[in-house]
A protein has these predicted regions:
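The feature encodes the CheY-like receiver
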Residues: 19, 61, 79, 91, ...
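Binuclear metal-dependent hydrolase catalytic cores
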Residues: 125-299, 304-309, 317-320, 378-411
Length: 411
């Protein structure tokens, strides 16, 4: 969605200094801002101004933020107006209550002047921030041949306007994610960590994710069990004293675990679908559905060529249906077709099969992901060119991206 650089914003806050700071930050970001410190007259002023967005303090005399939000949501003439609550109340109950009354966002005080305008913009645009923290497969690859795309293994994040925070996989990229969150001085982080499967390149950096050790944070780790081994046991096993000196008991944050099957569920108000994938062991792909947009995270996954004795058309049809019409398909593209000839049965796909899946499923944009550790930046550039050529030969409408470590996309 297009960013609203010139949105008309009305601030209601009985703290004149706070209102002044917010006005300055948003004006510098290109918005047109008005404000009032008089909560009692705010509704009438909003009716006259008809702004695109209201930013309102929750606790004010005479008329509090919840009541003002309720009045606005009950007025059909103000339909479509964004409402962002700001408050020093750090309680989860109050944030939930604000959303129940119709708020589109909840920003805690004291305001972070470095991130405030970006948070408001995300809510205005209603976009999802999708960021890649690691795009490699198998094991990290440092060195001068991996500077462009990065050498870290699988980790992708989705951040939503209402602060829902989804993390996909705990490869070495999650270490950089944790460092970034700590540098931003984020507090009371609530996030879901979705694990595709427990192979090393998808879980082995979880013990190095610093926010797990910070009291006040809360994480749920979700993924498929492996027979009689639960997700909790899978994560704790690699932190056993034999392999690693720190155990789960050292986590300072609240950490929960949930075993998933192939199913559909709702998490934090967002639709989540899971799909069992073609890979050794129990491996899940994820489809995230949010306000008319869908993001599919499909790694690791092997689609056999039609000439293979292992070719399974029923599986590929079900996978295409799972990804159908999605805005984003992030998927295992480990090998070129030539490389794949000697890697059949290793659990990963080649370019032609990935392109075929994206085209048949009519996805909007294909993201090449999970690159082989032996591939240099130049090799990945070549994979991108090969995929682009194949899409062109199919006369496909699918767009192509080969994300680099640190790339941010707004969906």
């Amino acid at each position: 969605m297009e960013q609203q650089n010139n949105a008309r914003i009305y601030i209601v806050d009985d703290d004149s200094l706070s209102a002044k700071v917010m006005s300055s930050l948003l004006s510098d970001s290109g918005h047109i801002v008005e404000s009032t410190t008089d909560a009692a007259s705010a509704f009438d002023k909003i009716l006259d101004a008809r702004p695109d967005c209201i930013i309102c303090e929750m606790m004010m005399p005479e008329v509090d933020g919840l009541n003002l939000c309720k009045r606005i949501r009950e007025n059909p003439d103000l339909a479509g107006m964004r409402f962002i609550m700001v408050s020093a109340k750090a309680y989860e109950f109050d944030q939930k209550r604000a959303f129940e009354f119709g708020a589109d966002g909840y920003i805690r005080k004291p305001l972070n002047t470095e991130t405030f305008a970006n948070l408001v913009n995300r809510i205005l645009d209603d976009h999802i921030d999708m960021k890649f923290w690691g795009v490699r497969g198998t094991l990290p690859v440092p060195g001068d041949q991996t500077l462009k795309y990065g050498g870290n293994t699988s980790c992708v994040t989705l951040e939503f306007p209402r602060e829902q925070f989804f993390i996909f996989d705990g490869g070495s990229g999650i270490k950089n994610l944790g460092d970034s969150l700590m540098a931003e001085k984020r507090s009371r982080i609530r996030a879901r960590i979705f694990i595709s499967h427990p192979h090393w390149d998808h879980i082995n950096a979880i013990p190095f994710f610093t926010p797990l050790y910070v009291p006040g944070n809360e994480f749920e780790i979700l993924g498929a069990n492996q027979g009689d081994t639960t997700m909790r046991e899978l994560i704790s096993a690699q932190m056993d004293g034999v392999y690693f000196p720190i155990t789960l008991s050292e986590f300072g944050s609240r950490v929960y675990f949930r075993d998933l099957e192939e199913e559909s569920l709702e998490i934090d108000g967002i639709g989540v679908e899971t799909k069992l994938l073609s890979h050794p062991g129990k491996c899940l792909g994820y489809r995230i559905n949010y306000n008319g947009r869908s993001i599919c995270y499909i790694t690791d996954n092997e689609m056999f060529k039609e000439t293979s004795e292992f070719y399974f058309p029923h599986y590929e049809k079900k996978l295409a249906d799972f990804c159908r019409d999605s805005d984003v398909l992030i998927t295992d593209t480990t090998y070129t077709d030539e490389e794949y000839e000697t890697k059949v049965g290793w659990g990963h796909s080649c370019i032609s099969k990935v392109v075929q899946l994206a085209d048949v499923a009519n996805v909007k944009t294909l993201y090449l992901f999970h690159h082989d550790p032996d591939q240099s930046d130049a090799d990945i550039d070549n994979k991108h060119e090969l995929a682009a050529k194949m899409l062109m030969e199919r006369n496909s409408s699918v767009k192509l991206e080969t994300p680099k470590e640190g790339d941010l996309f707004k969906i």
